[in-house]
Amino acid sequence: MASEIHMTGPMCLIESTNGRLMANPEALKILSAITQPMVVVAIVGLYRTGKSYLMNKLAGKKKGFSLGSTVQSHTKGIWMWCVPHPKKPGHILVLLDTEGLGDVEKGDNQNDSWIFALAVLLSSTFVYNSIGTINQQAMDQLYYVTELTHRIRSKSSPDENENEVEDSADFVSFFPDFVWTLRDFSLDLEADGQPLTPDEYLTYSLKLKKGTSQKDETFNLPRLCIRKFFPKKKCFVFDRPVHRRKLAQLEKLQDEELDPEFVQQVADFCSYIFSNSKTKTLSGGIQVNGPRLESLVLTYVNAISSGDLPCMENAVLALAQIENSAAVQKAIAHYEQQMGQKVQLPTESLQELLDLHRDSEREAIEVFIRSSFKDVDHLFQKELAAQLEKKRDDFCKQNQEASSDRCSGLLQVIFSPLEEEVKAGIYSKPGGYRLFVQKLQDLKKKYYEEPRKGIQAEEILQTYLKSKESMTDAILQTDQTLTEKEKEIEVERVKAESAQASAKMLQEMQRKNEQMMEQKERSYQEHLKQLTEKMENDRVQLLKEQERTLALKLQEQEQLLKEGFQKESRIMKNEIQDLQTKMRRRKACTIS
């Protein structure tokens, strides 16, 4: 059942106090209750550039994120607003407004770099907001993008000296789409006398400069990072909404009081975000919902607080630990529910119980497979197998006890009148033994005819008869109509009958052991079958992701080559070859 969203306004998600980042428990609690997939849009930019206004528009509200009207930065840390997605039913739009970068009151670029990195890691669409044109000053202010290789790791590696550039080659596989919003844009969009669209203007602005000087490298570095890390890019330009003096009242003004061009530009921006922003997805096609976003926030913030780099692989593994543990419990609960509905104890045979177990176990494994991911070394599936085996053994024990109780009760009802007759001396007379044996056979027949006695029926009966051997022998010995020879023959007959019953019970016990062993093997094969199918699906999913990444890298390499940047093209070619090698290995590793 979909969870209801009741956020009337934004709430601080990650607090920034004295340069220290902390996750807000109240915001995490809200996330933990949201089960729908999430489209996460984060906006970052210099302070006092109007980021919050755009986010309020995306929320469909005039007020919400604090706009402020002074040169002081209002937003501290990262603020969150979860609203129903206006274009994607069953999805939640999560808006993340961030602390303004470059706030002179902070004087701390370290904090800004972490805010920037967290916005990238948590979002599926990353909006960078700035004032004016994309000139060198704008690029210099975006130096945070060049810091990402020092702030984020894609893979967990025991080698602390692993090349950051090599690690950053994987960024493209999980980084968000990039949108650059240019506010108060007053120039004509053109280059070399030719009109440009905003997207063409962005592409033009990201062109590299040929040369090897320090100045050229400084010019190229942020551009290279944007091109390499964010292959899908979009640009929007916005006219000044009103005269400067009215900017302080922007959230109070009606659209009719704003520049019509600006109103249309904002509408175009919102329409693009609503239609094109993707659901936040992790490696393996795992769609992020509230609890998963909560886990990511905690993992990343805790890593930063402890002096480590936030690592995508670690975050996914931490999330997998939580979800796989829950998947085991969910699977066990399903098994118990199914067995509770289907099983009536005692069952007529062990096989009947094992067949019900097998069906319920298969469904439980399916529940686990659907709910789990990144189960390293299959530890959680092994845990599930162990718990299911214990549950099976518990049901077998309960079945045995239920059968014993049922049979003991039947024996009491059926045979107690006979015992009373023996006590009364009815069979202590000539010919009494034959009467006793006939009555015993009749009662045994009646016992066998009773339904749903279960698997202990024979054992309980034979145990009872054995306990009454002295009584039977006493009646035999006192019967004067029988010769000594006949008595001896009768004793031997009783012994043979008892031995035959014991042999039958032993045979039945061996058959039960064989059934248990066969069931254990079938259980193993069922786990293996479903695991193999999941591994194959995961392999295909990863190959699809790698193919998308490869296509983006090939596109960027071709563009670098076209622009004449041989060195950068060679670096990209090496990344492409590494990725192709991984893909060949994965394709060769067909699960059979």
Swiss-Prot record:
Membrane disposition: Lipid-anchor
Ligand binding (GTP): 45-52, 67-69, 97-101
Propeptide: 590-592
Localization annotation: Cytoplasmic vesicle membrane; Golgi apparatus membrane; Cell membrane; Cytoplasm, Cytosol
Cross-referenced InterPro entries: G_GB1_RHD3_dom, GBP_C, Guanylate-bd/ATL_C, Guanylate-bd_C_sf, Guanylate-bd_N, P-loop_NTPase
An example Gene Ontology biological process: cytolysis in another organism
Keywords associated with the record: Antiviral defense, Cell membrane, Cytoplasm, Cytoplasmic vesicle, Golgi apparatus, GTP-binding, Hydrolase, Immunity, Innate immunity, Lipoprotein, Membrane, Methylation, Nucleotide-binding, Phosphoprotein, Prenylation, Secreted
Residue ranges of domain GB1/RHD3-type G in the record: 35-278
Lipid-linked residues (S-farnesyl cysteine): C589
PTM per Swiss-Prot/TrEMBL: Isoprenylation is required for proper subcellular location.
Major site of localization recorded for this protein: membrane
CDD domains, sorted: GBP, GBP_C
GO cellular component, one term: cytoplasmic vesicle membrane
Subunit structure: Homodimer; homodimerization occurs upon GTP-binding and is required for the second hydrolysis step from GDP to GMP. Undergoes conformational changes and oligomerization upon GTP-binding and hydrolysis. Heterodimer with other family members, including GBP2, GBP3, GBP4 and GBP5. Dimerization regulates subcellular location to membranous structures. Interacts with SQSTM1. Interacts (when phosphorylated) with 14-3-3 protein sigma (SFN); leading to GBP1 retention in the cytosol and inactivation.
Family stated for the protein in its record: Belongs to the TRAFAC class dynamin-like GTPase superfamily. GB1/RHD3 GTPase family. GB1 subfamily.
Protein name, per record: Guanylate-binding protein 1
Protein encoded by which gene: GBP1
